[in-house]
């Protein structure tokens, strides 16, 4: 019986952001993800990890198709890891959305060796929506771009935290 190529990989580690950062090389792009029930917002950092920019919003289909697109984006951009927004409740507990995100991370980890960092995304979508409303973006347009912008928000927050820990100015 022939096994698929991805069955030969060691699963990627899934770690809190700071621990994941210790597994990433010093330079290289990171892929930021905002996981929704219908879409996945995708952002990417520059190789020096200073700035997050939007890439696209993936309309979710089946996990394998979604994962294939994410892995293709990671390969195209020579990414060294993923930052996945973890929707933690305001009281610090993890509800069904966080459990679903962790399950997605476990499944993705089985297909890649790129370390996956989890970053608290509390209120990211709300903050982005307020910003888009402030920019007078129509409701229809907000619906199209909110997940990608949330991914930017999540990844930029993670990059800023890593920058602070490194002592960069």
Predicted regions and their residues:
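Phosphate- and other anionic-substrate recognition elements at nucleic-acid/protein interfaces
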Residues: 5-33, 38, 43-169
